[in-house]
Structure formats: C-alpha cells, structure tokens
C-alpha cells in the first residue's frame, strides 16, 4: 500500500484541529474587536475600595472553652429610697408572769434599813462636830465669811437655805453654833421696814436688839445675828458668817 494517498487526509485533520482552537478563543473573547487576536491574561490591577459594613449578624452560640473567673465586685451604688412600711405583724401571745423571789424584797428592805441607820449616824456626827439640830432642822456652818448674796448661793448649792429662826429654841441653837456674827435669812429689800423671810412670808418670831431695826445709812436691808442672840439690821453688801439650815 502506498503512503502518499493518506497524506492529504493527515493535513486535513491538522487544519481542522487548528480551526477548532481558533473558534474557541474567539468565542471566549466575543467582546473584543475582530482585529485583536486572543492573548495571555494581563497583570492584576490594584485592590478596589472597601465596601460598606454589612448588617449586624445574629448573636453567636457560646464558645466551647472554660468559663472565666468571676470579676471583683463593683462599687456600691447610691442608697435607694426607703421602702414602704410593712404590715404589722400578728400580736404575740401573753407571756408568763415574772418571778420575784422573796429574798429580793427582803434584801431591798434590809438595804434601806441599813442606809437609814447610816444616815442617822452621819447626822448625829455632824450635829456633834459641826452643827446644831432643833426639831426637824439642822443648822450648819462652814466657817466662811462672805456677803449675803454669796451666803444664799452657798446654801442653795447644798439644797439648803440661809438659817432663819422661827422660835427662841432655833435662835438659841444658831447662837450656840456660831463664834462670829452671822447672816439670817431675813430682809426688807422689797418693802422698807417690812422684814420677811426669803420666801416672802412675814415673820412670826423676832428678837431685835434695842433700837433696831433703825436702817442707819438707808441701806440696811439684811439681818445679822449678834453674839448675844439678838438681831440687828445691816447692809447686805457687808461680809459675815454663813449659816445654812437643812430640813431633816
């Protein structure tokens, strides 16, 4: 068999294949002009601008890692407004009566008796050493010399009053107590010539010295107990012995 008859057939096959590749390239470049031949791809251009943010996605599922430690407590916030008052609770049951042992009352009575005995002993000691007692009055002096206003303040400080004899026995007790002339709780400061006690009551007992009261110098509004037990009016600004009386 001769090889030459098949040579045309081979050439025809090569031409057909080349035509097929040309058609394929042209089909891919339909927008290119017919005069421009197909070629290899060009170099990539610069990146374009970022696009706008998309919409927020849904919350994802919790991660699978371990949970972190709890953070430190935050600062205390401002106090809130007081809440409304609650409803009253139910009334409680009546309690059992208290117990008071007999020994408590007897002990209190014995303590009172002991205190009274001690007070009586102190009064007797004071009467013997510093003062004089007549009836329900106790007269006491600290031996100080002062003005009438200071005598009043001193006696008030000890819840007492300036000594004021209501009868001869009390006047004698004060006289026996003092070694110096002493103020009495009697004045006529409000009404001249009308002597009253410090509560404003008129006197029911007096023991004026002869010629007294005479208001010599026009300012003798206080009363002085002399060493002989009689009275004399003197200025309240003068200084004399302080004597106080205590009710007992």
UniProtKB/Swiss-Prot annotation:
Hydroxylation on proline residues within the sequence motif, GXPG, is most likely to be 4-hydroxy as this fits the requirement for 4-hydroxylation in vertebrates. Residues 49-61, 93-102 have a biased composition (Basic and acidic residues). It is found in: Secreted. Residues 112-130 form a coiled coil. The keyword Ion transport does not apply. Disulfide bonds join 155-244, 222-236. Calcium-dependent lectin involved in innate immune defense. Binds mannose, fucose and N-acetylglucosamine on different microorganisms and activates the lectin complement pathway. Binds to late apoptotic cells, as well as to apoptotic blebs and to necrotic cells, but not to early apoptotic cells, facilitating their uptake by macrophages. It holds the Pfam family Collagen. The gene is MBL2. Residues 75-87 have a biased composition (Pro residues). This is Mannose-binding protein C.
């Amino acid at each position: 068999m001769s090889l030459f008859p098949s040579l045309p057939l081979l050439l025809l096959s090569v031409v057909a294949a080349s035509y097929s590749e040309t058609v394929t390239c042209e089909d891919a470049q339909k927008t290119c002009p017919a005069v421009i031949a197909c070629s290899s791809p060009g170099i990539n251009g610069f990146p374009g601008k970022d696009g706008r943010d998309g919409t927020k996605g849904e919350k994802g599922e919790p991660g699978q890692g371990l949970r972190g430690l709890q953070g430190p407590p935050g600062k205390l916030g401002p106090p809130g407004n007081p809440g409304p008052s609650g409803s009253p609770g139910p009334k409680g049951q009546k309690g059992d009566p208290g117990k008071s042992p007999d020994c408590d009352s007897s002990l209190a009575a014995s303590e009172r008796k002991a205190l009274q005995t001690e007070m009586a002993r102190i009064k007797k000691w004071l009467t013997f050493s510093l003062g004089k007692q007549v009836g329900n009055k106790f007269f006491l002096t600290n031996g100080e010399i002062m003005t009438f206003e200071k005598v009043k303040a001193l006696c008030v400080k000890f819840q007492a009053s300036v000594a004021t004899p209501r009868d001869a026995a009390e006047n004698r007790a004060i006289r026996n107590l003092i070694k110096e002339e002493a103020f009495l709780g009697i004045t006529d400061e409000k009404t001249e010539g009308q002597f009253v006690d410090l509560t404003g009551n008129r006197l029911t007992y007096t023991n004026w010295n002869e010629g007294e009261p005479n208001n010599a110098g026009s300012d003798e509004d206080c009363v002085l107990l002399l060493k002989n037990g009689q009275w004399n009016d003197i200025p309240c600004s003068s200084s004399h012995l302080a004597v106080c009386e205590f009710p007992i």
